[in-house]
C-alpha cells in the first residue's frame, strides 16, 4: 500500500503544477464536506490556484464551510451554486448551465474547464419510497 506521506507529496505536487477547478455536489455535509476541506488544506497557500463551485441547498451551510476553507486556502475561490434537488434532471441541467456560465466568467482568459468533480449529494433509502 502507498504510504500516506507519499500521497500528501503527490497531492502537493499537483497543486503546485497548475490551477485546479473543482465542482462539488453535496459538500455542505458528510463526506463531501470532508473532501472539500481536505482539498482546501492540500492546496493551502502554496498552490497555483483553486476555484471550487459548490452545489448545495442551503447558503448558510456553504458560508460556514467556506469560512473554514478560506482559512485553509486563503487564495482559493469558493463559489456557491444554489441547487434545490439534484435528483431532478431539470435541476441538474440548470446547475450545469450556471456552472458553465460562472466558469466562463471566472476563467479570465484561460480555458474554462473542470478538473475535478466530486458528487456525494443526497442519501439512499433502502426502505423504499415513503412519500405516499
Model segments located where?
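Rossmann-fold NAD(P)H-dependent dehydrogenase/reductase core
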Residues: 2-132
